[in-house]
């Protein structure tokens, strides 16, 4: 845990929407008078029929029921496009940066309206209406946003499936939400390689019987694909023939907007359901206040729309606010490790939101690839996806932001719809590695294993004591699982599944998933804490820590470590790292195994697959599960071959 604090600068105190005094006042009102507070904030979106009811929620396990603005009627596409046309129709809505640096284009709000209306009409022509589900299996191209908004325009429910998922994973998700239409592309592009999306989709549909009636195929590469007459539709031909005007479908605030599948600790993936009104209010509000978005900013979130971060902070939040949002098809290290910073200079990006895993990977290449670029346009940095260790935070702040850009280290989940714990750049002194303080309306508590609420400085499990508008409403088709997963462990509270520490200033430090806790000789250790210690060593680029069976301790600590470029593994360095962690955290945290690795198994979105690392450490090589979603599946073979202990 870092003891450094970075105060809010005078510039940010004066310029930001929210300063410290305003945060304190607004937060107090949001907790004490939620109906009044959210009744006002709900007006940030336009309503066809205004709401009269604001909050109607229950966390009682016998009756979990979450409703916000429930008697209001609106439309998400109207709020993200139509209402901006009169004042910013010619403003860029989406900046697209392709995998190839020569491939970029700007799409105005008028052009976005045209494309979305045409695709909405195509969907209607193929029998899609209000309440029907449409699955999207697309690369990071503007057509992904068009498809999401086209569904929203006609009241259809979209289910975006990450383009890195295997045919089996795709099939399971199509079956789960019974999509009659699938929108995909011939191929995707990622790091100079082609991804066979249409071929994968064909294999998936073959496994799902007659659920999918229509497959709409976007031409991305022009590569040869198999074609099923009567089922497959060429996107370009269909939209060219469609009308550029499509009337809005009025939907209730609680009408589902999308289903997004996320992994559960047990069983099949969970179809997280987010609804229209509360979700959009929360996505818009968090985007504006957390990133301090002002007209003229160029905002870039590096996530994929296949994940919730892409939904909330590439598409819905920014577009609801009339922003210019950048969509990036590529990867941080193609064609060079300067790519992120070159894109920032090319498009004059002012707000940059990325994942700690990307920052740590780029740290391994040193400062030179960053410093060869200007980055003068940047004014705010963000972090999302997992806790950022203090060393990566400091590097991000010093090297990328040149010590002038605050970092909003945001904590939230697929289930929360938007950011729950975060600094606000004009209000919150920052501590490297801490998500700091709750956003408006968010009531975090730290509880022990029995559910007793802990006060003051403490460590335990993180729960949220009351609802917020962006919260998921249910698991698609399985409300009992929703209640069991989130409200039964600590009845009356939403259980996040994360561990947490609270310091003397009331700041929250996320310590990692509770299922990423190692129990060493009866002592609980968060893996994030050990990983952070290892990465603090100057020769370490990345680290991932898991538990494995130990005859004496119950669980031992198995550390996978990748080194900085040019550093060779050695027994001496292994001993040095073990001593380093002992000194940093204490003898209880001593790694039993330090496994030097050439790389870690990551999904194409950059998430480290700790499940696979756990199985390798446990020698359960036959139980690795699906590795097809990994950016480089060959890393797994190398890790198995070199397993230690």
Swiss-Prot record:
This is Acetyl-coenzyme A synthetase. Mg(2+) binds at residues 535, 537, 540. It comes from Beijerinckia indica subsp. indica (strain ATCC 9039 / DSM 1715 / NCIMB 8712). Its cofactor is Mg(2+). Catalyzes the conversion of acetate into acetyl-CoA (AcCoA), an essential intermediate at the junction of anabolic and catabolic pathways. AcsA undergoes a two-step reaction. In the first half reaction, AcsA combines acetate with ATP to form acetyl-adenylate (AcAMP) intermediate. In the second half reaction, it can then transfer the acetyl group from AcAMP to the sulfhydryl group of CoA, forming the product AcCoA. PANTHER family: ACETYL-COENZYME A SYNTHETASE, ACETYL-COENZYME A SYNTHETASE 1. It holds the Pfam family AMP-binding_C. Belongs to the ATP-dependent AMP-binding enzyme family. Keywords: Acetylation, ATP-binding, Ligase, Magnesium, Metal-binding, Nucleotide-binding. The gene is acsA. Coiled coil: none annotated. Disulfide bonds: none annotated. CoA binds at residues 190-193, 309, 333, 521, 582. The keyword Metal-binding applies. InterPro entries: Ac_CoA_lig, ACAS_N, AMP-bd_C, AMP-bd_C_sf, AMP-binding_CS, AMP-dep_synth/lig_dom, ANL_N_sf. NCBIfam families: Ac_CoA_lig_AcsA, PRK00174.1. GO terms for biological process: acetyl-CoA biosynthetic process from acetate. It is an enzyme of class 6 (ligase). GO terms for molecular function: acetate-CoA ligase activity; AMP binding; ATP binding; metal ion binding. One of its GO terms (cellular component) is cytosol. CDD domains: ACS. SUPFAM superfamilies: Acetyl-CoA synthetase-like.
């Amino acid at each position: 845990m870092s003891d450094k604090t970075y105060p809010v600068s005078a510039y940010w105190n004066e310029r930001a929407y929210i300063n410290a005094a305003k945060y304190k006042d607004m937060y107090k009102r949001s907790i004490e008078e939620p109906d009044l507070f959210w009744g006002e904030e709900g007006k940030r979106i336009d309503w066809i029929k205004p709401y009269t009811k604001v909050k109607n929620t229950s966390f009682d396990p016998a009756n979990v029921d979450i409703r916000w603005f429930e008697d209001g009627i609106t439309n998400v596409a109207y709020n993200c496009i139509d209402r901006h046309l009169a004042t910013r129709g010619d403003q860029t809505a989406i900046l697209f940066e392709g995998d190839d640096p020569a491939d970029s284009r700007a799409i105005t709000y008028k052009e976005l309206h045209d494309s979305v209306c045409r695709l909405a009409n195509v969907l209607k022509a193929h029998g899609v209406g209000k309440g029907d589900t449409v699955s999207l299996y697309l690369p990071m191209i503007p057509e992904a946003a068009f498809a999401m908004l086209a569904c929203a325009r006609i009241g259809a429910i979209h289910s975006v499936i990450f383009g890195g998922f295997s045919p089996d994973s795709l099939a399971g998700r199509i079956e789960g939400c019974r999509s009659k239409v699938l929108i995909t592309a011939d191929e995707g592009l990622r790091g100079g390689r082609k991804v066979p999306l249409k071929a994968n989709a064909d294999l998936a549909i073959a496994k799902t019987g007659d659920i999918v009636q229509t497959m709409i195929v976007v031409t991305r590469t022009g590569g040869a694909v198999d074609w099923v007459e009567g089922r497959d539709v060429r996107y370009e031909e269909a939209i060219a023939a469609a009308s550029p005007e499509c009337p809005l479908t009025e939907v209730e605030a609680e009408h589902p907007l999308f289903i997004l599948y996320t992994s559960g600790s047990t069983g099949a993936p969970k179809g997280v359901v987010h609804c229209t009104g509360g979700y959009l209010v929360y996505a818009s509000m968090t985007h504006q206040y957390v990133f301090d978005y002002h007209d003229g900013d160029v905002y870039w979130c590096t996530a994929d729309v296949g994940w919730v971060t892409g939904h909330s902070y590439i598409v819905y939040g920014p577009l609801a606010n009339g922003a210019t949002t950048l969509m990036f098809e590529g990867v941080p290290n193609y064609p060079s490790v300067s790519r992120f910073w070159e894109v920032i200079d090319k498009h004059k990006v002012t707000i940059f939101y990325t994942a700690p895993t990307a920052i740590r990977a780029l740290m391994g290449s040193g400062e030179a690839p960053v410093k060869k670029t200007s980055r003068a346009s940047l004014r705010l940095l963000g972090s999302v996806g997992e806790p950022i260790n203090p060393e990566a935070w400091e590097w991000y702040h010093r090297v990328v932001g040149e010590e002038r850009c605050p970092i909003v280290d945001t904590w939230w989940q697929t289930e929360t719809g938007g950011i729950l714990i975060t600094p606000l750049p004009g209000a919150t002194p920052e501590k490297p590695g801490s998500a700091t303080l709750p956003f408006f309306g968010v009531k975090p508590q730290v509880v022990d294993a029995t559910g007793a609420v802990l006060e003051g400085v403490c460590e335990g499990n993180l729960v949220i004591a009351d609802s917020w508008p962006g919260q998921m409403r249910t698991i698609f088709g399985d409300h009992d699982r929703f209640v069991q997963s989130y409200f039964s462990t600590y009845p009356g509270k939403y259980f996040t599944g994360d561990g947490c520490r609270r310091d003397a200033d009331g700041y929250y430090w996320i310590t990692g998933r509770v299922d990423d806790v190692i129990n060493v000789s009866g002592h609980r250790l968060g893996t994030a804490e050990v990983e952070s210690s290892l990465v603090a060593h100057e020769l370490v680029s990345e680290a991932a820590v898991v538990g494995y069976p130990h005859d004496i301790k119950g669980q031992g600590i198995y550390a996978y470590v990748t080194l900085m470029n040019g550093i060779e593994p050695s027994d001496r360095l292994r001993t040095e790292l073990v001593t380093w962690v002992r000194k940093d955290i204490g003898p209880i945290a001593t790694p039993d195994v330090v496994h030097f690795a050439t790389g870690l198994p990551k999904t194409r979105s950059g998430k480290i697959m700790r499940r696979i690392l756990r199985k390798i450490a446990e020698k359960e090589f036959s139980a690795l599960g699906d590795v097809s979603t990994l950016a480089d599946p060959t890393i797994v073979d190398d890790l198995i071959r070199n397993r230690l202990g």
